[in-house]
């Protein structure tokens, strides 16, 4: 598939899509490695700090000098600033050297932001290719204010004028990597598109448990739910039952560049899937929140804290993963970066950093924070499903239907409620229907 993708990118822009757990991120990372091996300049951009980290890149807001702007009017005002003009001059020079721009998690990029990206690229006369990666059936862009815009009918990137200009070749991955159970995968694929019948309903209803069964589940199950407050309460309650001493690790935040505003730094730290204050105990069940291939832990991996070690000036957390592997975890440093041209290459400037252990308590997690994770033993609390694609994202974290449970306190008919919370944006359905995928 990598060869095919590279051949298409030689001539066309590409939209790489597919459901959850089909290997989009893996293929993207392989492509980046291949380009770098060939000494081709490819830049990986994420819609958030976490997605940027996962593909070894920077955020698209940082790279394209978008600041906090969410529409062209605000961007035009920002661009009149002298410091901004200097940044844009550097960006223009950098774009002349880049052969491929990759934008990950495109479903989280709004039409307005994508239009601003188009504005930047057109002004810079960018001649390279663009690869956008993601699944519009998953979580949509976060829109702070539902205000009147040019894209009022739909907030997705595919509704922007720039999307049409790019004339993408569409590729869809469809071979499951997360689960080996084809019946489960096929049912997930159908509800992803909003299709529901009695057979599918019966399958998911058979996974339902009541409160007593929930309480009797082993602690190695992770509960996914829609609201932060419930997640925090569950994790706090489970942690308080452990009799070992409480240990708190505070994230170490450093501003390396004085140009970075405090609110910009706070926003960046908040978008990472780490805790500014991590409270743990020996014996606590944790989940890893990032991929670190070199150290053998991955986003969604779980384990139990065996010990907390203080050696000279270093601190380690000894964790036994569910598969029995022992990890001696060190704090991880995330960098806020910007790219700058240096001759025919580019250099990375560090603007800020935050250092923290990349774990959280695993008893409960919000659905939004679980995107991209594979979870072996999973309970989906479906009481507070409110967003398009949210139910599908929650259920598709599971690797095995035999260790997937569905919990709800709703007294109404399960089938009626399940159908009601299976929210799919009609614009997304229409988009996939009218486009051909290779």
Where are the model-predicted features located?
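Conserved ATP-binding/catalytic motifs of P-loop helicase motor domains
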Residues: 1-438
